[in-house]
Regions:
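Positively charged, small/polar-rich N-terminal and surface patches that mediate targeting and assembly
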Residues: 1-97
Length: 97
């Protein structure tokens, strides 16, 4: 059976978190624009699919970058389409400062 987890991450530090997902987990991700319900302010949401064994690592990574980030973890039954693979990705050109 297919087993994966999807994370919805809402944070003002979305760029830093996204960079770390790429560098540390070698995963692709998507940014969504959102509107906060209470304050009606603009938000960015990161959506990423990872294996269950990567959950502890990504939670720690998020906590390090933004302890106040809102994170929702959902079960993913299937992931299809361009850009999704568990194969090794290209070497990174980004270097974290």
């Amino acid at each position: 059976a297919y087993s994966a987890r999807g994370l919805l991450i809402i944070s003002n530090k979305y760029e830093q978190i996204g960079k770390m997902i790429d560098l540390k987990l070698d995963r692709g991700f998507t940014y969504f624009k959102a509107l906060g319900g209470y304050k009606q302010d603009d938000k960015r949401v990161i959506y990423v699919v990872v294996s269950p064994r990567e959950i502890a690592t990504i939670k720690q990574l998020i906590r390090q970058e933004d302890p106040n980030a809102f994170v929702s973890i959902i079960e993913v039954h299937e992931a299809l389409g361009e850009g999704f693979t568990y194969k090794q990705k290209r070497h990174h050109l980004l270097i974290r400062k």
